[in-house]
Design a protein with these regions (language model features):
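Short, low-complexity N-terminal intrinsically disordered segments enriched in polar/charged residues
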Residues: 15-46
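Surface-exposed, charged secondary-structure patches
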Residues: 58, 66-116
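Short beta-strand edge/turn micro-motifs at domain boundaries
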Residues: 104, 120-131
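Short, solvent-exposed secondary-structure junction/capping segments
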Residues: 30, 34, 48-62
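Hydrophobic pocket/interface hotspot
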Residues: 32, 44, 52, 105, ...
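Short, solvent-exposed loop/turn segments at secondary-structure boundaries
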Residues: 20, 117-118
């Protein structure tokens, strides 16, 4: 009975730790997009690995298309883009799954260009925790 009571005392702490990790992951994603919007390569670099890469999916003639983009090229394109038109990616909701050092952050978004909705979709971001 003592073991059961002790276990029940720690269950809420386990959930709290998971929520704290989710908050940290959400903060990482928000920091990335803050750097994206401000064309700040240092801010972006503070939350990505040097081996970062981006995959982009789309449809062409009803077929799925996958593009692989080198992270350095992506960041260079973001920070060197002109000030106009203004890009704004609005992050709408976060669904975060964590398993050990691996996390997936699923983020619904709207992409606006000069205050006009361009498109919407989902960012699926895989993150790895380095100990």
């Amino acid at each position: 009975m003592k073991k059961l009571i002790l276990l029940l005392l720690f269950i809420p702490l386990l959930g709290f730790g998971q929520n704290l990790e989710k908050e940290k992951l959400q903060s990482v994603v928000k920091t990335f997009f803050e750097g994206f919007h401000n064309k700040d390569s240092l801010l972006i670099a503070s939350v990505i690995d040097s081996k970062f890469y981006l995959n982009s999916t789309s449809f062409k003639e009803d077929n799925g298309v996958l593009r692989n983009i080198n992270g350095d090229n992506f960041v260079s394109a973001i920070v060197s883009r002109p000030d106009s038109p203004v890009w704004k990616e609005k992050l709408l909701s976060f669904n975060i799954k964590i398993d050990g050092p691996l996390a997936n952050v699923w983020v619904d978004y709207e992409f606006w260009v000069d205050d006009k909705l361009s498109h919407c979709g989902v960012n699926s971001i895989n993150l790895l925790k380095f100990f």
